[in-house]
Amino acid sequence: MKTIDANTIINREKLSPLQWMVFILGFFVFFCDGLDTGIIGFIAPALLDDWGITKPQLAPVLSAALVGMSIGAIISGPLSDKFGRKGVIVFTSLLFSIFTILCGFANSTQDLMIYRFITGVGLGAAMPNISTIVSEYMPVKRKAFLTGLAGCGFMLGISCGGVLSAYLLESYGWAKVIIIGGSIPLILVVALLLKLPESTQYLITRHQQDKAQRILEDIQGHSFQEPVKLVLTQAENASDENPVKVVLGKYLWGSSMLWLCCFTSLLVFYLLTSWMPTILKTAGFSTQQFSLIAAIFPFGGVIGATIMGWYMDKLNPTTVIKYSYLIAFALFIVAGLVSSNIFLLGLTIFLIGALLAGAQSSLLPLAAMFYPAVCRAVGVSWMHGIGRIGAILGAFFGSLIFTFNLSLSGIFFILALPTFISFIALSLKVIYEKSKNKQVLKLEESL
């Protein structure tokens, strides 16, 4: 019986139709996740007017989904590593689709808060798991680029929510806009059931050789000529280890820095996506102006994540992302200085999106590359879940902005600080990894 490393087939230069299918499905899961995540922020000004509620009264509604996302991400990782990626992705995609539609029929802030919480559980569970499975199917030389490119669907989804709101909100109302946003993922769920394969790395670690073999034969385009035993590299094949113990053991320092980075990054990201339309409206911008400027932010993230993914495959991926946060920090200062000029503000918001939102999108493929298969879903999901706690705080801090009557310039100056902390966290991760590598080299030289 011939022994074959499954990754040698996946890592071929040319992607197979099955790998492209995983990429496309991953992109659309990210797109729908972004659409249903961001759409509540775009309809928030209309919701305030329609229901006659105050901004602090709306804050729990905006935060409910973020609480759900944190819970969904944290609990889905162990479930995915135990029961498989596909089932978790399909179920959670269906969950956030149905409850986003129900949001359009809510009659009170309490109903809307409950629906958004359950929506958030689905959104939070789907994203890290689809990122994991896309990463596992992409060849190593283009893993960061293609995984990051699929992740751009999230930013495009948020932008699409802004465009829908800009052209439909005033004519059709907030309820129809959010129902449209929830209906699109229902089509995707059918495609996921029919076309998304299970992770071959998961199947091999769970000793399901026959299923993994059929998928790998599909990727290479022909059957194996003799009986084979599929294996993974030594780092990937520690299937008997407890994934939680692996994350909290030898990967603890790197995990801690990823958690801190994701926490502060998502705090800023979700404060902007949840409250930017309302902040800009309060500053005097029209509905079309604030919707389009707010949509520019995640669209910049699409450009940024694409470029970063390419560089992450060529250079140290952590270093690429950390400098993106540093430049984003400087751009927040610039945004505060040019906030009175709509053209310069829009341009700066686009660049912040390219660097901050692009870096945030790139954290998922970075984490997927950092962890081995045995704990990859747990590691990625926990980073995402802990980061969502920052998102929750971001949504609440957004409501406090109006309490303190901060100027638009003051808001941008404040947002620069957590962005700088993200840079520091990744810098510490790089320093630790370099120190650890030097220790390994010294040990090898002494033997």
Please describe what each predicted stretch is.
Residues 21-55, 272-277:
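Extracytoplasmic
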Residues 1-35:
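Cytosolic juxtamembrane N-terminal segment immediately preceding the first transmembrane helix
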